[in-house]
């Protein structure tokens, strides 16, 4: 059986056929507390949930949902969480900080979750923080490649996304490259230094990355690519949050924005339902 948060019913509909689909009732009380009410669900159950935005409220709803499923006698619980919140806090950056991604995964493991299907974790090694969980970290390289037909070069804005650029470029059969990022220790200013392995002059360039939040990284990479002679710059981003004035900032440079629907947004050209369906069928 598949049960879904209201904000993920569209995604759950793409999974129909694996099992019956039902909606989780959700309520927010005047004092801010939340409550869920589940349809009758036993046996193997998949919970489909977009946890962004309102990540903290949605995480509590998810914890309550899982606990209610355990009380109801579910034999296996699979979570479909397209965008995993707190994934960017993947290590302890300063003394005294938690590793927030590990905390979330540990809580889910303690709640007797069997597995999680997610899309494009910020760092893949986050999955190792919860060895008891079966974690499927998917990347829509094929879907991006189809949307980026005609591109000449795939570009990562920094070394951290090189594996994404390589995966898409391999399918497109075009070269890929990345910018080396340097931060001035006194001013904090970031400079992007291009590698010399790929010529961007008069090329259609696709920048791939996992998250578009304020747009700063993407716009800097776009400007650098156009300074190097790129004719057009596209962006293929997995999780498009588009915070503050990100839309206007990105549109000021990027010629086309392509996002997935892991987070609901106006540029969600790539749907990830088919990708998730394949993995869910294997787990249930």
Swiss-Prot record:
Quote the record's binding site residues for Mg(2+) 1.
Answer: 122
Task: Note how many cofactor molecules are bound and how.
Answer: Binds 2 Mg(2+) ions per subunit.
- From the UniProt record, which GO molecular function terms apply? ATP binding; kinase activity; magnesium ion binding; ribose phosphate diphosphokinase activity
Annotated Mg(2+) 2 binding lies at 158
Listed binding positions for D-ribose 5-phosphate are 183, 209, 213-217
Q: Where does ATP bind?
A: 31-33, 88-89
Enzyme active site: 181
List UniProt keywords, sorted A-Z: ATP-binding, Cytoplasm, Kinase, Magnesium, Metal-binding, Nucleotide biosynthesis, Nucleotide-binding, Transferase
User: Do the record's keywords include Zinc?
Assistant: no
Against InterPro entries, the record matches this protein to: Pribosyltran_N, PRibTrfase_dom, PRTase-like, Rib-P_diPkinase, Rib-P_diPkinase_arc
Q: Name one GO cellular component term.
A: cytoplasm
Into which EC class is this enzyme placed?
Answer: transferase
Listed PANTHER family = RIBOSE-PHOSPHATE DIPHOSPHOKINASE FAMILY MEMBER (PTHR10210), RIBOSE-PHOSPHATE PYROPHOSPHOKINASE 2 (PTHR10210:SF32)
What the record says about family reads:
Belongs to the ribose-phosphate pyrophosphokinase family. Class III (archaeal) subfamily.
Q: What is this protein for, i.e. what is its function?
A: Involved in the biosynthesis of the central metabolite phospho-alpha-D-ribosyl-1-pyrophosphate (PRPP) via the transfer of pyrophosphoryl group from ATP to 1-hydroxyl of ribose-5-phosphate (Rib-5-P).
Q: Which NCBIfam families match?
A: ribP_PPkin (TIGR01251)
The molecule here is called: Ribose-phosphate pyrophosphokinase
């Amino acid at each position: 059986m598949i049960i879904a948060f209201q904000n993920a019913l569209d995604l759950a509909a793409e999974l129909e056929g694996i099992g019956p689909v039902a909606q989780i009732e959700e309520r927010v009380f005047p004092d801010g507390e939340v409550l869920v009410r589940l349809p009758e669900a036993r046996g193997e159950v998949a919970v489909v949930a977009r946890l962004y935005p309102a990540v903290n409220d949605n995480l509590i709803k998810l914890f309550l949902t899982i606990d209610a499923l355990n009380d109801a006698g579910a034999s296996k619980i699979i979570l479909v969480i397209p965008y995993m919140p707190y994934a960017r806090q993947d290590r302890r950056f300063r003394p005294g900080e938690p590793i927030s991604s590990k905390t979330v995964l540990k809580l889910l493991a303690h709640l007797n979750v069997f597995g999680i299907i997610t899309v494009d974790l910020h760092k893949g090694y986050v999955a190792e923080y919860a060895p008891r969980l079966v974690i499927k970290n998917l990347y829509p390289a094929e879907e991006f490649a189809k949307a980026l037909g005609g591109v000449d070069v795939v570009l990562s804005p920094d070394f951290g996304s090189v594996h994404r650029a390589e995966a898409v470029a391999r399918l497109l059969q075009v070269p890929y490259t990345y910018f080396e990022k340097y931060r001035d220790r006194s001013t904090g200013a970031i400079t992007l230094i291009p590698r010399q392995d790929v010529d961007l002059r008069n090329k259609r360039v696709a920048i791939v990355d996992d998250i578009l939040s304020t747009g700063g990284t993407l716009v800097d990479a776009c400007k650098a690519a156009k300074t190097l002679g790129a004719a057009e710059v596209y962006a293929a981003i997995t999780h498009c949050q588009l915070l503050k004035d990100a839309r206007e900032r990105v549109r000021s440079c990027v010629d086309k924005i392509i996002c997935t629907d892991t987070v609901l947004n106006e540029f969600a050209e790539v749907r990830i339902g088919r990708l998730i369906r394949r993995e869910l069928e294997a787990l249930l």
